[in-house]
Swiss-Prot record:
Pfam family, one: Copper-bind
Note on how the cofactor is bound: Binds 1 copper ion per subunit.
Organismal lineage: Bacteria, Pseudomonadati, Pseudomonadota, Alphaproteobacteria, Rhodobacterales
Location of the protein in the cell: Periplasm
Annotated protein name in UniProt: Pseudoazurin
Superkingdom of source: Bacteria
GO molecular function: copper ion binding; electron transfer activity
Main location: periplasm
Keyword Metal-binding: yes
Organism: Paracoccus denitrificans
Length: 123
């Protein structure tokens, strides 16, 4: 399956957001990050990646297609707006093994608040 995530200056949950911020996917799915508004990118939060998955970082203003291959949680951030809480989460498969890592990863306060809200949707 293919999923779309828009990178926005303003969305339903406030300023500087990925929308949707939480996606449920299966191994092999593609997540398309679309720079709907300018000045955004998508970068892996290296503490929130399944084992064996390489980090990734897109260029500002460019679309990026992430193919999720391994089960677990994939945390993403917008590099320039991480401090403003621009984070997203992709859950691949069930019962992610790296949930603890996602819950304890150090990040700016606003990013942590939004990540916690996204983690509340994990099942």
């Amino acid at each position: 399956a293919t999923h779309e995530v828009h990178m926005l200056n303003k969305g339903e949950s406030g300023a500087m957001v990925f929308e949707p911020a939480f996606i449920r996917a299966e191994p092999g799915d593609v997540i398309n990050f679309i720079p709907t508004d300018k000045s955004h990118n998508v970068e892996a939060i290296k503490e929130i990646l399944p084992e064996g998955v390489e980090t990734f970082k897109s260029k500002i203003n460019e679309a990026y297609a992430l193919t999720v291959t391994e089960p677990g949680l994939y945390g993403v951030k917008c590099t320039p707006h991480f401090g403003m809480g621009m984070v997203g989460l992709v859950q691949v498969g069930d019962a992610p093994e790296n949930l603890d890592a996602a819950q304890t990863a150090k990040m700016p306060k606003k990013a942590r608040e939004r990540m916690d809200a996204e983690l509340a949707q994990v099942n």
